């Protein structure tokens, strides 16, 4: 049976066995959330799902019944950007020795084989998802996320050649946006016509507009549930200590609120947002962790609150409280999931117009009233343009604000629900069999 035939069968039925290989965690950054939500959507659709990843505490997450297997690692964890991990030793992919790379691939491939056979193996990231899939001996589909392309493969011909070799054996290659497909063509020589575009998804049942009183009460209740995280043993990957009291005080009153959710690193443009906020009468909540936090917090004024990273149980209540959600990245983004999630909650996103974020903006603009379409995006790296559009969004009349909020939600329901995305991946995989 060819790759196309067996994948077509997967797309037609339920109750099949699906393996998802993901080299990292299940919380925090975009590909982690992607893996978690896809596993849950497929599980809820009646499939038998196993997630192979490095998450040390999977019980914290609702995976809809999916099982988690953690492959044993004897060496370092290959990463694209250095972060701290609870019980893994990260090392930049480009700095790994050949022996370290081969050991990582084989240990993960062995874990995949032990869970086989499967109707579908989905591996995340061109590297190292492609090599792990190829070494597993199972038919595999590779999902490109973007971070591996920009932070590891760009400028490294050897890594690009390795990716090209392992993608050749994939049944299909998926990307979340036309931008990522274009980068794949640029770096690997894989024509964009060979890549199937399936945008990431949003849990539209959990992430929805809520009345302010309900949303604030829910946010404070979830924050009160957080485990202690005192300064003397602070874990940057967990919410800050005392967030419930801090948020209660900070969000008192009806002053306009701007929200940022994402990593705190230079390429995410948070400094640009802080610069723009100095020209706007608003308060801002900054959610996330990363190497630039101390510098950003020192540069922020009293109208800005940093919370550390929050989980979706918090964000489901925080996004509805935000008058605007800003995604100011200055570096290419594969898609911009947090912008879509904000839109699902009725919080109008304002995104930098480039890469995958431009595709988010295009989806919003198709739903926005004509006279408000210019408020979906701003010019990358332009703090003045960001400030102007942010001020205009915050000054909308009640009718226009309601129209933009409803349109943002509608854009997500039409394009980016997880249930639809999960089925689209199966269908795209069946259509995209390479050489099958």
Tell what function each PLM region has.
Residues 174, 217-268, 274-278:
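Conserved donor-binding/catalytic core segment of Leloir-type glycosyltransferases
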Residues 171, 258, 320-334, 347:
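Acidic donor-binding loop of glycosyltransferase active sites
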